[in-house]
Regions:
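HotDog/MaoC-like acyl-thioester-processing domains
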Residues: 1-12, 97-152
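Hot-dog-fold acyl-thioester-processing enzymes
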Residues: 2-90
Length: 152
């Protein structure tokens, strides 16, 4: 893993990176349902979900969104930022759920930094355009702009 300064991150604008695959198991979906209180049958009841057009249980859209940090951490070519005291999620733009993620399927993130700004001395903000792909599917599960702030 390469280590770069926060300022050097600006030189990576437009450079695409791809994460490793992550399995979205039924257990993960069930735990997310418990954490959020969203127990709709399409997520947690395999027998009833078989009767839907999906044919199986599917991940919550917000579960898919919440995988962004895990996928970022599992991106082999992502640089490690030197001198960062902390990083925080600032928000998101243009979040769209384009296809359901079937239980026990695998997803990965394809991302690139599209904007980088110094907000004030020691505080930086960057926007990452991210697509979450489903293994074996031509249609992505989700697209989003993910905004992160880092401090040194």
């Amino acid at each position: 893993m390469t280590t770069i300064t926060i300022q050097e991150l600006a030189t990576r604008i437009g450079s695409e990176q791809v994460s490793d695959w992550v399995e979205v198991s039924q257990e993960m979906i069930d735990k997310f349902a418990d954490a959020t209180g969203d127990h709709q049958f399409i997520h947690v009841n395999p027998e009833m979900a078989k009767l839907t057009p999906f044919g199986t249980t599917i991940a919550h859209g917000f579960l898919t969104l919440s995988l962004l940090p895990q996928l970022a951490a599992k991106t082999p070519d992502a640089p490690r930022l030197d001198g960062v005291k902390m990083g925080v999620n600032y928000g998101g733009n243009k979040v769209r759920f384009l296809a359901p993620v079937p239980s026990n399927s695998r997803v990965r993130g394809r991302s690139k930094i599209v904007q980088f700004d110094e907000k004030r001395p020691g505080q930086y903000q960057y926007t990452t355009e991210t697509t979450i792909e489903i293994e074996g599917s031509d249609k992505p599960a989700m697209i989003a702009e993910w905004i992160t702030q880092v401090f040194n």
